[in-house]
């Protein structure tokens, strides 16, 4: 597993929090490719683990030229996330957004794996985690 330290911040708004991340590489969300840049990720439904099974994740570039809302699975933890985390998985030469956790939440958003990316011995699967030490 590779860890990637990146600029990660809590995107505060009057209505909902989110995660702001400077992603230094191209990545895929669903069937859309996003260039390297700074993005805001946030749960639109604020789903609860154990109660809800789906959420909708918003991915938006801070420059305003890229946007995607995608249905995700809800994953849970017994403890609140102490800091925001955005996880990417590299497979078949591409990097895919795989999970987003907002600080203070016990539920995260996990994107469904694409069926056309069947794991084989030839595919290298590496997880890149963008996070920061929150004090």
Language-model segment annotations:
Residues 2-10:
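C-terminal segment of classical bacterial N-terminal signal peptides
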Residues 9-29:
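Short acidic, Pro/Gly- and aromatic-enriched capping/linker segments at domain boundaries
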Residues 28-36:
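N-terminal helix-cap/turn-to-beta initiation motif at the start of protein domains
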Residues 35, 46-49:
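Primarily extracytoplasmic ectodomains and periplasmic/lumenal surface modules that are beta-strand-rich
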Residues 37-41:
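A short tyrosine-centered beta-strand micro-motif
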Residues 49-82:
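Mature extracytoplasmic domains of secretory-pathway proteins
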Residues 70-135:
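Beta-strand-rich cores of mature extracytoplasmic or soluble domains
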């Amino acid at each position: 597993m590779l860890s990637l330290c990146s600029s990660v911040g809590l995107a505060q708004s009057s209505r909902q929090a989110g995660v702001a991340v400077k992603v230094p590489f191209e990545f895929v969300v669903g069937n859309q490719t996003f260039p390297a840049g700074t993005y805001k990720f946030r749960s639109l439904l604020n789903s609860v683990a154990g109660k809800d099974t789906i959420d909708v994740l918003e991915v938006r570039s801070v420059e305003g030229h890229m946007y995607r809302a995608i249905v995700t699975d809800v994953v849970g933890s017994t403890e609140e996330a102490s800091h925001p985390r955005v996880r990417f998985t590299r497979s078949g030469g591409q990097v895919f957004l795989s999970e987003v956790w907002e600080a203070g939440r016990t539920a995260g958003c996990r994107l469904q794996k694409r069926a056309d990316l069947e794991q084989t011995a030839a595919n290298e699967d590496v997880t890149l985690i963008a996070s920061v030490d929150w004090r």
